[in-house]
From Swiss-Prot:
Residue(s) at site: Cleavage (non-hydrolytic): G248, S249
Record membrane topology: Peripheral membrane protein
A single GO molecular function term of this UniProt record: phosphatidylserine decarboxylase activity
Name of protein: Phosphatidylserine decarboxylase proenzyme
Gene that encodes it: psd
Modification Pyruvic acid (Ser), positions: S249
UniProt source species: Chromobacterium violaceum (strain ATCC 12472 / DSM 30191 / JCM 1249 / CCUG 213 / NBRC 12614 / NCIMB 9131 / NCTC 9757 / MK)
Amino acid sequence: MSERLFVLSQHILPKLALTRLAGRFADWKGGGITTAAIRRFIARYNVDMGEAADSDPAAYATFNDFFTRALKPGVRPVADARLVCPVDGAVSQLGAIDSGRIFQAKGRDYSATALLAGDADLAARFADGHFATIYLSPRDYHRIHMPCAGRLLEMTYVPGDLYSVNPATARGVDRLFARNERVVCVFEDEQSQPFVMVLVGATIVGSMATVWHGVVNPPRRPAVEKWDYRGQDIRLAKGEEMGRFLLGSTVVLLYPAGPLKFNPQWQAASPVRMGEAMAS
């Protein structure tokens, strides 16, 4: 299928119905059928099970257990850097936020305000800051970790579309990350500077979860919902798990204006691993 036809199909497919169906299957304890499906998935996507804490496909009761598998201790060392990569995946884009606009792909951008569910005051804090967008493929490790130490301030669930998230849709779907379902997590670092981690949903991404809340979706809510954690003193260390995707999608990171130098090896489409140096 050509890229143009694939993008066109994204406007036609019953994305929510497909995602709900996939979510039910992913939670199903199918015994030998589930194990066979996991083995096929491993072969299809060349998943490196040698890194998994449990490499036996039969050890996973459900697809969700497999998707969110833990890694062996020590296989993702956390670099001594100001910011480290929060996930395994590939760089979609990164760079400067230009007067509140975030680059998506050639000829396409979107506003930080739209990404942050219309919160103009929060978006203004990143108007000329920095961003990094990282895509997780189906073969990747699906847990999300902290790029630096942080204290949780708030979380917002944003209902939206469920377009597939990959390089083709980034090039072909306008404002992709600001229109898909997402979870916006706002932190402050040890210097009391804000930073944001946006977990972006997609077709067949059955749910997103955080370590402090558990599963955020489903259920899928019809309106924006916000939780304030300022009074709970929830602190996470650099490299500590903060959430997870079921299957895979994208994380968008926002940082305020100021000196920040991304790893020069990071370019669009560069493969990255959780814990490696992201910025200094």
